[in-house]
Amino acid sequence: MDEVAAYQAAHPKNKEHFIAENQLEDKPIIALLAGSRKQEIKDNLPDMLKAASAFPDYQLVLAGAPAIAPEYYKQYVGEAKVKIIFDQTYSLLQHADVALVTSGTATLETALFRVPQVVCYYTPIGKVVSFLRRHILTVRFISLVNLIADREVVKELVADTMTVKNMQNELRNIIENEAYRNEMLSGY
């Protein structure tokens, strides 16, 4: 938390500079934080891109993980219209309007930057994970935001519930429903 506060104090918000520096369009931003490990990126990024691409009034900006080579992303990006930026995750969050975020510390960082988000986490053994979550595991949430609040502040689409349609519905709800968006932000 201190790291985010220090960043915000040292880097006043300047969207025009961020757009120019990264050759972005002057459009609202859907930030994509697809994880920091190759398997997470492989499992999550393709559907995140499909879901976010349904919003043509927004531009897609992907936070590249520092330990992942730019070439690795190319196999999953395909023809999607997305800009990949590295070493600027906090700047991206500072200027994002909404985010799709793979579960992990990034969910808490996204909340600290007050960006409405959908938490996404797919696993190839989704049905098994869903069964375990419903019948065996006692942890109700996977995102740090919800775990800390001990209630659902942000929607978690995990395993078999992480579908393109569900992500699109949740993004649409955040974008179009101001009361829903504000309720999420007040939960931060």
What are these regions (language model features)?
Residues 1-188:
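Nucleotide-activated sugar donor-binding and catalytic core shared by glycosyltransferases
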